[in-house]
A protein has these predicted regions:
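Acidic/glycine-rich C-terminal interaction modules and beta/coil loop segments
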Residues: 52-53, 63-65, 69-159
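Feature for secretory/organellar precursors and membrane-associated catalytic proteins
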Residues: 6-100
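Plant-biased intrinsically disordered, low-complexity terminal regulatory segments
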Residues: 2-3
Length: 159
């Protein structure tokens, strides 16, 4: 049985997705550290819109399964806000910017929203998909072998 907090979260997510599907932009708070350093959980919010065209490098909200359970049947799916790193036909491969190894998988139809911006605590908006943002994300992905050390430094500096 679902506890009341999870039930409340599920209702909020369902309403946000309904609005996005109707073409309304929704600002949604994020949790966790899987998108460091670009999106900080517990601090930033993301602006979600209905996904039209999906490209490698887009940050999306999707219902996914992690790569360590791909071979299992009836695996519980989870919503994540992660970056698209590859396509394989109708399948989408996602990875959090703060993740070292973990990838998630879903179908294109399981991508429910695209992040078009990040709202910082001071109200400043950082648009996603700009040339500068895409370059920074690409460089960050290339630095994957060093990400563990870069994230350690980032967390020490941000304390």
């Amino acid at each position: 049985m679902m506890d009341s907090a999870k039930k409340s979260d599920a209702l909020i997510m369902a309403e946000a997705l309904r609005l996005v599907n109707e073409g309304v932009s929704v600002t949604f708070p994020v949790n966790g550290c899987s998108m460091l350093p670009f999106i900080v959980g517990g601090r930033d919010s993301v602006i979600l819109e209905k996904p039209v065209d999906l490209c490698v490098g887009d940050v999306v909200l999707a219902l996914t399964i992690p790569d360590n359970v791909l071979h299992l049947e009836n695996v519980e799916k989870h919503y994540v806000i992660h970056r698209i790193v590859a396509f394989s036909g109708e399948n989408v491969v996602l990875m959090g910017d703060g993740n070292l190894v973990q990838r998630e998988y879903c179908k294109r139809t399981d991508v429910y929203a695209k992040v078009i911006g990040v709202v910082r605590p001071n109200g400043k908006k950082s648009l996603q998909g700009t040339f500068a943002e895409r370059c920074a994300a690409k460089i960050w992905y290339i630095l994957l072998p060093f990400r563990r050390y870069l994230l350690w430094i980032y967390k020490k500096v941000k304390k």
